[in-house]
Amino acid sequence: MIKTRAIVLHRFPYSDSSFIVKVLTEESGIVSFIVKGGKKKESPFRGALDPLALSEVVFRQNPNTELQFIKEATLLDWHKDLRNDLLSLAKAQVITEMILRYAPQGVPLQEEFERLEQSLREFNETCGSSANAANAATSSSMQNAEQNATPSLNASATSASAIANSAESLSAIPASAHKSNIFARWLLDTCDMWGYNLDLETCSRCGHTLDKPAADFFPETGGFICHACLGVETPRARTETLQGLWALHNGDKIEHPEFTENALLAYLRHHIGFLKEIHSIKFLNETRKLFGK
């Protein structure tokens, strides 16, 4: 019997009452479960086997079959705040689909598990902090509106306190966990995990260390070009992409994350081949349009 933590990558119906669930486990890599009766309201697995949920599962692994029977599933983290942020949710779905389609099968994937767990936790924390800050600001505005035309000293102090608490909540998030960086950081780390190391600080032509954003980037080779080597040539990469990759390297906030994410996806696509379509990328692109990002 195996007892391990697992993150749900994908779930789809198997019959009128059952699911097939694919999870990334901490000890056994990617495992597929058949969950009989999983659609029923009284199912003991409700919530614990929802997509993106972190749970502790117990199962007996049968090497002679692809589908395993799950015995127990205990929900550890449902990532509620992540689910309430549509753009972060879309990025998380791309991450889980890429792992499901391209991570090595049939082997332990502890590093992939740890990195995915970290990314989901960071999404959840930053989404929660942003929501709390927005709620505090709204509450402060409502309190001010309820005061007389000449607000009291106590009312002003309450408003200032709410704003200060919001700022403190946001500042408590590590620089590496800027919401704008999380997906790009996962992509960069995945390049390393899967053997496609990307050097963000060295010019691929002269070998000199970059001290500012590169002048150009080539996703086909992963090469960065310094300004001296580029000379009068016209760069192919957008300025937003180059600045974003430099911000990622330094752990700073990425102002236009969609360009950085697309550049890293293009690099991985070239090396992996992306023979299997990543369907959730279409949803991500539509969500970006919705939010203007």
Q: Over which residues does each language-model region extend?
A:
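Non-catalytic alpha-helical scaffolds and adjoining flexible linkers that form interface surfaces
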Residues: 1-19, 24-136, 142-154, 162-293
